[in-house]
Amino acid sequence: MRLTKKTVFIGIASLLILGLAAWGVNVFLVMNNAQKSFDKNFIHFQAKSDDNETFITQGIGKKEAYNLSYSPAKKTIEISKSTKNGDIYSSDSIYGAVKVYDIKQNANRYVFITAAKPIIVDFGITSVKVTYDGGHFETPYSELHFGETFPSEDN
């Protein structure tokens, strides 16, 4: 069999299409796994007493990290920002804690209907974006952590 330009072109195009398909499947699986974990560990989390459930935390080594926390017992949601200064971490609430009245889901988007303005969680191709009144933050899937419980400060 003789290799012609047409045969080589078809071979390269086939490999390119297979590579793109594999990349697309990988992106879908990462996003789908993150969304399933969010649903299991956050939306349907069953906390003991007044424990809060943290959904998004960015890498521990970062100077700033954003957290979306939920207290199933109190039905409240809060967004906080942790800042690292040397070896010391400080955390400030930047939104909440506000009462959650309902959670709406539409494909890759969750909308938390709260006593204030809604909080929107969008699962994108490479990251999760949380939008709230006054701002937003985005976390790549590689820095995303789920299901971290900690006692509420009110206990």
Question: What does each model-identified segment do?
Answer:
Residues A13, N32, F42, Q46-S49, ...:
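Prokaryotic Sec-type signal peptides and long signal-anchor helices
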Residues I10-N26:
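Hydrophobic membrane-insertion alpha-helices, especially the h-region
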Residues T57, S82-N155:
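Extracytoplasmic electrostatic interaction patches
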